[in-house]
Amino acid sequence: MRKVSTGFVYFFGALGGLLFGYDTGVISGAILFIQKQMNLGSWQQGWVVSAVLLGAILGAAIIGPSSDRFGRRKLLLLSAIIFFVGALGSAFSPEFWTLIISRIILGMAVGAASALIPTYLAELAPSDKRGTVSSLFQLMVMTGILLAYITNYSFSGFYTGWRWMLGFAAIPAALLFLGGLILPESPRFLVKSGHLDEARHVLDTMNKHDQVAVNKEINDIQESAKIVSGGWSELFGKMVRPSLIIGIGLAIFQQVMGCNTVLYYAPTIFTDVGFGVSAALLAHIGIGIFNVIVTAIAVAIMDKIDRKKIVNIGAVGMGISLFVMSIGMKFSGGSQTAAIISVIALTVYIAFFSATWGPVMWVMIGEVFPLNIRGLGNSFASVINWTANMIVSLTFPSLLDFFGTGSLFIGYGILCFASIWFVQKKVFETRNRSLEDIEATLRAKTGEDAAELSTTK
């Protein structure tokens, strides 16, 4: 490991999140111009938007088993290359099908980043800082979305502006690759693959030369590493079942509470309550800025409040905001007061999501799976998250036509409150606990210990 600061490691380790956010957010503005220049029908527009989601499902599915075998850092470098190729391929696409293929390739990198980075950051960070460090991923995602909104607005006056919008992502992709050349490998992976001295060196840097902490962590990792790498049978086995339920549940609830539909369709919502198109786009940028600020605050407090308490507070705030917003939208026609109430409620909803469910879901799926299948487990949870994202995004326009904006958001609000039951019943607390302690608790609960599992394939 080259001599680099912990800040450098955390920044470049999380940088893939910026590409994740940018590449999922930029299409909301670019599609307006792509549709006109390529003369796309409704189903073709839907495919341009959804191709990244399809690629993300594939990328997340592939990356988990691969990262357990080849390491987190190598796969992060590969993701950067795929980001770069996908961005330039999208920008230079001459026709519809080339664009779709490029967007699927890009989506594979997005899915890989979502499955890989939370695990990588969780395995690098000391237990007392893991929540803060892991939530940097979500901060980068929100920063990427904001950058996409600004880029969309900046190039909206150019005929070929959409090519610049899509191609701009190649710049941070190149930076991620260059930074990744210097990043260390995950110490957990290094111990598991027999590189003990290198793992100790990485932990020494990340723990700021606290030898007591380093020795304890090395011993704990070695104990977990005795267990042979597991596969799909262990992922669905008795011991991992509590982790799997948490991962799947958090991944689904984060999407079905309406977060991405609100973010993707915010300009449409603004125009529905009386904003002009230009004002709606500027308001979208304003929401993006607010989003980043709130997420930054969440990063600062992530290790000071229990994870379960954070998401439950978020669910209550989001649910109430959606109820208020739906009522405001029902009466927004011709009523400036109702329109203002709807916009305020929308902003409050996004604030609660950005401070709670946005970062905490990614933090926790990087924590709850045992070392020997952590990559596979995180990958599976990410696949579920992207699948739920795709289903919600594809069904939103039809549900909107059928129920209307107000009634639909009441439904999302009910799901917010349903998530509280799930968190209270199924989720265990992980704050200020080492990854090995979390794993030991799982094994104790299910009656399986390291000695038993180290002899099973």
Swiss-Prot record:
<keyword id="KW-0472">Membrane</keyword>
<dbReference type="InterPro" id="IPR003663">
    <property type="entry name" value="Sugar/inositol_transpt"/>
</dbReference>
<keyword id="KW-0769">Symport</keyword>
<feature type="binding site">
    <location>
        <position position="138"/>
    </location>
    <ligand>
        <name>beta-D-xylose</name>
    </ligand>
</feature>
<dbReference type="InterPro" id="IPR020846">
    <property type="entry name" value="MFS_dom"/>
</dbReference>
<dbReference type="InterPro" id="IPR047984">
    <property type="entry name" value="XylE-like"/>
</dbReference>
<keyword id="KW-0813">Transport</keyword>
<feature type="transmembrane region" description="Helical">
    <location>
        <begin position="164"/>
        <end position="184"/>
    </location>
</feature>
<dbReference type="InterPro" id="IPR036259">
    <property type="entry name" value="MFS_trans_sf"/>
</dbReference>
<feature type="transmembrane region" description="Helical">
    <location>
        <begin position="104"/>
        <end position="124"/>
    </location>
</feature>
<keyword id="KW-1003">Cell membrane</keyword>
<feature type="transmembrane region" description="Helical">
    <location>
        <begin position="380"/>
        <end position="400"/>
    </location>
</feature>
<feature type="transmembrane region" description="Helical">
    <location>
        <begin position="402"/>
        <end position="422"/>
    </location>
</feature>
<dbReference type="Pfam" id="PF00083">
    <property type="entry name" value="Sugar_tr"/>
</dbReference>
<feature type="transmembrane region" description="Helical">
    <location>
        <begin position="131"/>
        <end position="151"/>
    </location>
</feature>
<feature type="transmembrane region" description="Helical">
    <location>
        <begin position="46"/>
        <end position="66"/>
    </location>
</feature>
<feature type="transmembrane region" description="Helical">
    <location>
        <begin position="14"/>
        <end position="34"/>
    </location>
</feature>
<feature type="binding site">
    <location>
        <position position="362"/>
    </location>
    <ligand>
        <name>beta-D-xylose</name>
    </ligand>
</feature>
<comment type="function">
    <text>Uptake of D-xylose across the boundary membrane with the concomitant transport of protons into the cell (symport system). Transport is driven by the proton motive force generated by either malolactic fermentation or by the metabolism of D-glucose.</text>
</comment>
<keyword id="KW-0762">Sugar transport</keyword>
<dbReference type="GO" id="GO:0015293">
    <property type="term" value="F:symporter activity"/>
</dbReference>
<feature type="transmembrane region" description="Helical">
    <location>
        <begin position="338"/>
        <end position="358"/>
    </location>
</feature>
<protein>
    <recommendedName>
        <fullName>D-xylose transporter</fullName>
    </recommendedName>
</protein>
<dbReference type="InterPro" id="IPR005828">
    <property type="entry name" value="MFS_sugar_transport-like"/>
</dbReference>
<comment type="similarity">
    <text>Belongs to the major facilitator superfamily. Sugar transporter (TC 2.A.1.1) family.</text>
</comment>
<dbReference type="InterPro" id="IPR005829">
    <property type="entry name" value="Sugar_transporter_CS"/>
</dbReference>
<dbReference type="GO" id="GO:1904659">
    <property type="term" value="P:D-glucose transmembrane transport"/>
</dbReference>
<keyword id="KW-0812">Transmembrane</keyword>
<feature type="binding site">
    <location>
        <position position="385"/>
    </location>
    <ligand>
        <name>beta-D-xylose</name>
    </ligand>
</feature>
<feature type="binding site">
    <location>
        <begin position="254"/>
        <end position="255"/>
    </location>
    <ligand>
        <name>beta-D-xylose</name>
    </ligand>
</feature>
<keyword id="KW-1133">Transmembrane helix</keyword>
<dbReference type="InterPro" id="IPR050820">
    <property type="entry name" value="MFS_Sugar_Transporter"/>
</dbReference>
<feature type="binding site">
    <location>
        <position position="260"/>
    </location>
    <ligand>
        <name>beta-D-xylose</name>
    </ligand>
</feature>
<feature type="transmembrane region" description="Helical">
    <location>
        <begin position="81"/>
        <end position="101"/>
    </location>
</feature>
<feature type="transmembrane region" description="Helical">
    <location>
        <begin position="244"/>
        <end position="264"/>
    </location>
</feature>
<dbReference type="GO" id="GO:0005886">
    <property type="term" value="C:plasma membrane"/>
</dbReference>
<feature type="transmembrane region" description="Helical">
    <location>
        <begin position="309"/>
        <end position="329"/>
    </location>
</feature>
<feature type="transmembrane region" description="Helical">
    <location>
        <begin position="281"/>
        <end position="301"/>
    </location>
</feature>
